[in-house]
Amino acid sequence: HPLLQDLPKDFTVFHWHGEGFDCPKGASIIAETQAWPNQGFVYQTPKHKQRGTWVLAWQCHFEVTKESLPKMVSNGNAAIQSGLKDYPETVQAPDEILALGAKYVEENNARLATMFNRIAASANK
């Protein structure tokens, strides 16, 4: 899809959710994980098609920053601990979340900025 043309086929992005979603009829799934089959989709209503615009939806967090991640982990520690007990195969320990965040957060912020710029450019055509 043109809005996603520079995204790698596989990449690591931050997840913090315990629920999934069904895609709208006619949507194209653009991302999935082993734990959650629907992680993102693109979609066009008839009005979007007329305008040449798209709905782009993600169930992951490109917007997490090096500053916000420790706050999220601290404030969400009870949820993390519960998740570690209930879903140990998909929930990571706080130290692992912070280490992986430090590794991936900047490239994901750049990916988000690129997607936003493409969305804005497509809306201005």
List the predicted regions and their residue ranges.
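Acyltransferase
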Residues: 63-125
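Pocket-forming structural segment of enzyme catalytic cores
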Residues: 1-67
